[in-house]
Each structure stands twice: as structure tokens, then as C-alpha cells.
Amino acid sequence: MIEPILLGIVLGMVVVTLAGLFVAAYRQYQRSNKIGL
């Protein structure tokens, strides 16, 4: 069985990682948009 605490830590890290990648990609997209215009 997977310990609830370990599962919570893993899920939390995954969510934070995905959120960080999304924010980084969004900022880069905005930057390229401004440069393109």
C-alpha cells in the first residue's frame, strides 16, 4: 500500500511542477508575442 503522506507529497510536487511549467510557457509566449508585434 502507498502511504497517504507519501502520496500527498508526490501529488503536490507534480501539481507544483506542472503549474511552474505552465507559467513559464505562458510568460515565454507573451514575451514572443510582444516581440513579434
Curated annotation (Swiss-Prot):
Keywords, alphabetical: Electron transport, Membrane, Photosynthesis, Thylakoid, Transmembrane, Transmembrane helix, Transport
SUPFAM superfamilies per the UniProt record, alphabetical: PetG subunit of the cytochrome b6f complex (SSF103446)
Superkingdom field: Bacteria
Biological role: Component of the cytochrome b6-f complex, which mediates electron transfer between photosystem II (PSII) and photosystem I (PSI), cyclic electron flow around PSI, and state transitions. PetG is required for either the stability or assembly of the cytochrome b6-f complex.
Disulphide bond pairs: none
One record GO biological process: cytochrome complex assembly
InterPro entries: Cyt_6/f_cplx_su5, Cyt_6/f_cplx_su5_sf
Compartments in which it is found: Cellular thylakoid membrane
Main location: membrane
Transmembrane segments: 5-25
One annotated Gene Ontology cellular component of this protein: plasma membrane-derived thylakoid membrane
Protein name in the entry: Cytochrome b6-f complex subunit 5
Membrane disposition: Single-pass membrane protein
Family that this chain belongs to: Belongs to the PetG family.
Species lineage: Bacteria, Bacillati, Cyanobacteriota, Cyanophyceae, Synechococcales
GO molecular function, one term: electron transporter, transferring electrons within cytochrome b6/f complex of photosystem II activity
Subunit composition and interactions: The 4 large subunits of the cytochrome b6-f complex are cytochrome b6, subunit IV (17 kDa polypeptide, PetD), cytochrome f and the Rieske protein, while the 4 small subunits are PetG, PetL, PetM and PetN. The complex functions as a dimer.
